[in-house]
C-alpha cells in the first residue's frame, strides 16, 4: 500500500496497569504474548478479555476506551501492529473526534 507503513510495538502491562483512553490514526492489530488484556473499543460492544495467542482489532478513529491488565499480580504483554499513512501521529490521547 503506497504511502502507508506498519509500526510494530511491544507493549508491557505491569500487574494492575490501566491504560489511558486513546485512539489511533490507522488500523491496529494487537496480539497477546503473555497474560491477559481487558479491552473495549468503541463500536465493538462490551469489555472483552483476550488471552495469550488471541488478537483484537481497532478500526481507524475508534476510541480505545479500556486497555488494562486483567491481573493484579502477573504482567501482560502484547504486540501492537499499527497500519497508518506515513508521517501520521500513531497514538493520540483522549476520544476520537
Model-derived regions: residue spans:
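Glycine- and acidic-residue-biased ligand/ion/polar-headgroup-sensing regions
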Residues: 24-44, 52-54
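Short, low-complexity, Pro/Ser/Thr/Gly-rich segments in the mature regions of secreted, periplasmic
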Residues: 87-97
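Short acidic-glycine-tyrosine-enriched beta hairpin
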Residues: 2-3, 13, 43-61
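Extracellular/periplasmic catalytic domains that process cell-envelope and extracellular macromolecules
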Residues: 1, 23, 31, 48-49, ...
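A short glycine-rich, His/Asp/Glu-containing loop-to-beta-strand
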Residues: 1-21
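Histidine-centered metal-chelating micro-motifs
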Residues: 18-20, 38, 46, 56-69
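Extracytoplasmic
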Residues: 3-8, 24-27, 61, 76-78
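Ligand-binding loop in jelly-roll beta-barrel domains
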Residues: 62-88
Amino acid at each position: 500500500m503506497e504511502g502507508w507503513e506498519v509500526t510494530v510495538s511491544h507493549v508491557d502491562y505491569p500487574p494492575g496497569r490501566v491504560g489511558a483512553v486513546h485512539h489511533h490514526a490507522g488500523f491496529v492489530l494487537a496480539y497477546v504474548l503473555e497474560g491477559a488484556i481487558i479491552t473495549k473499543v468503541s463500536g465493538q460492544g462490551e469489555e472483552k478479555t483476550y488471552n495469550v495467542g488471541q488478537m483484537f482489532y481497532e478500526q481507524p478513529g475508534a476510541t480505545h476506551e479500556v486497555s488494562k491488565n486483567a491481573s493484579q499480580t502477573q504482567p501482560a504483554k502484547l504486540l501492537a501492529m499499527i497500519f497508518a499513512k506515513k508521517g501520521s501521529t500513531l497514538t493520540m490521547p483522549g476520544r476520537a473526534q
